[in-house]
Amino acid sequence: MARLKTRYNEELKAKLQQELGIKNVMEIPRITKITLNMGVGAAATDKKLLDGAVADMQLIAGQKPVVTLARKSIAGFKIRDGWPIGCKVTLRGEQMYEFLDRLISIAIPRIRDFRGFSSKSFDGRGNYSMGLKEQIVFPEIDFDKIDRIRGMDITITTTARTDDEGRALMRTFGFPFK
């Protein structure tokens, strides 16, 4: 079992229940999924860039990403409907907790000039979204083998009903907020 999942079940659940004043154990907020998204806008002109993004995402997430397609043609961005423009991965269960553990303990400390995540990035329903500017903060990525620096969006979906519950959940996991 993942280290973070064991810690959540054994100590963090009770701490959250007491902190939020919840009586029913099924109401305690938990993380349901983590979605990683990498938009590769330049893939419209160079298809090889998307292959590199898919390879990086597969190393980071531990599972094969799905290629996302443009929903409509936009002349200003020089893309057509149905063209591949990015990739995404949805992590659940054990892989989700393993990724979250690596993110909190290894990747976040390696971010340059990091002062904490914004606590305003909650969506109003307890879900948190953040962006990373470079994929090289993850130890799985070999700096010498990447073709270019790419960023990614990370969305953490929770069962929390409010932003305060979501913020409390993320703080107990060890997320550094400003």
Swiss-Prot record:
GO BP field: translation
Gene Ontology terms, MF aspect: rRNA binding; structural constituent of ribosome; tRNA binding
SUPFAM superfamilies: RL5-like
UniProt KW Transferase keyword: no
InterPro entries, per database record: Ribosomal_uL5, Ribosomal_uL5_bac-type, Ribosomal_uL5_C, Ribosomal_uL5_CS, Ribosomal_uL5_dom_sf, Ribosomal_uL5_N
The keyword Nucleotidyltransferase is annotated on this UniProt entry: no
Membership in a protein family: Belongs to the universal ribosomal protein uL5 family.
Name of the featured protein: Large ribosomal subunit protein uL5
Gene source species: Acinetobacter baylyi (strain ATCC 33305 / BD413 / ADP1)
Lineage of producing organism: Bacteria, Pseudomonadati, Pseudomonadota, Gammaproteobacteria, Moraxellales
